[in-house]
Regions:
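Metalloprotease/metallohydrolase-associated module, dominated by Zn2+-dependent proteases
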Residues: 1-30, 34-91, 107-162
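Active-site recognition of the HExxH zinc-binding catalytic motif
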Residues: 95-107
């Protein structure tokens, strides 16, 4: 069975990144957790995962803490694989947390009397590019992607020149 514990090291990194690059998250509740072992998805190791907790699970958190839940309860959770974290360099750790923070969004309603809405965003090319600009090719999968892009550009040039 998978176990989870709080991840203060991830939280420290996230706080700095939020201040620098993700200011829309400054007043958003985020919990940081270690997952004891990495999950896998489609044959790939999952280093981290961003989640939105709302509804019954969010209310249950307040019940366990023995405080009164607000009318609308929602928060984010960043889950990081503790076993894989140990294999990463410090710059890779920062890049991983930055990448996961890119998935956390806040929709501001047009009506002044409406509440903001927390959303999980998919992989966005602009945000992906921003993380690569800030941290470089921090994972082998990103290097593989770059090589594929380079190969495609070479093929396009050959077809254009040929």
């Amino acid at each position: 069975m998978t176990s989870y514990t709080t991840a203060p090291a991830v939280e420290r990194i996230a706080e700095k990144l939020i201040e620098q690059h993700h200011r829309h998250l400054l007043d958003v509740p985020i919990r940081y957790l270690w997952r004891d072992k990495a999950a896998s998805s489609k044959g790939n190791v999952v280093l981290g995962k961003a989640r939105k907790v709302t509804g019954l699970p969010a209310h249950l958190v307040h019940l366990v803490r023995k405080d009164e839940p607000p009318e609308e309860v929602e928060f984010f959770v960043l889950e990081i694989a503790a076993d894989m974290w140990q294999t990463l360099t410090e710059p890779q750790r920062v890049a991983l947390v930055d990448h996961e923070l890119c998935h956390l969004g806040v929709e501001i309603p047009e009506r002044a009397d409406a509440d903001r809405k927390l959303v999980i965003r998919g992989h966005d090319l602009e945000e992906f590019a921003a993380v690569v600009e800030r941290h470089g090719l921090w994972r082998p999968a990103i290097e593989t992607f770059r090589a594929a892009v380079d190969a495609q550009l070479t093929l396009d040039e050959a077809m254009r020149d040929g």
